[in-house]
Regions:
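Terminal targeting signals and extreme-terminal segments of soluble enzymes
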Residues: 1-146
């Protein structure tokens, strides 16, 4: 990727992070999500796996995973709409859990992407990846522009 495109992607990632810190869910801001890559329609971010997000079985809770997947699509929507600050909402989020995320794995990566962008709806896919690259969960989602 040429340097100008890499710089544009870094600027987009920083803009999304700043906007989310300013107007996003306070709860999700406490998750310490870090956007590591962004381009229009795609955002990759990490989540530190810490004890407060895990349940007694020693794995990351499904509630935390779902919240991150929904937030990942928020990031994607922000990457698509760079100028108008349009509002949007979740219409549908369906998740499949494939394997547990061990409490002591460090951090995990989420990759969220728009699969089809329309005038009123955006269809998305979000994957949760373990540090070794194996997928732990995936979701499909539909968002609506308001």
């Amino acid at each position: 990727m040429p340097d100008a495109e890499q710089n544009d992607d870094r600027v987009l990632a920083a803009r999304i992070a700043a906007q989310f810190q300013e107007g996003g869910s306070r709860l999700m801001c406490e998750f310490d999500l870090t956007i590591v890559d962004a381009e229009p329609g795609f955002v990759r971010f990490t989540l530190p796996v810490v004890p407060r997000l895990c349940h007694g079985g020693g794995v990351l809770s499904g509630q935390a995973i779902l919240a991150c997947m929904d937030t990942g699509m928020v990031f994607v929507m922000m990457s698509i709409d760079e100028t108008s600050n349009a509002t949007f909402t979740t219409v549908h989020l369906q998740t499949a859990f494939e394997r547990g995320v061990p409490e002591h794995c460090g951090e995990v990566t989420f990759e969220a992407r728009a699969m089809k962008t329309g005038w009123s709806l955006v269809f998305g896919q979000i994957d949760l990846l373990l540090p070794d690259g194996r997928r732990a969960a995936s979701a499909t989602t539909t968002y609506m522009w308001l």
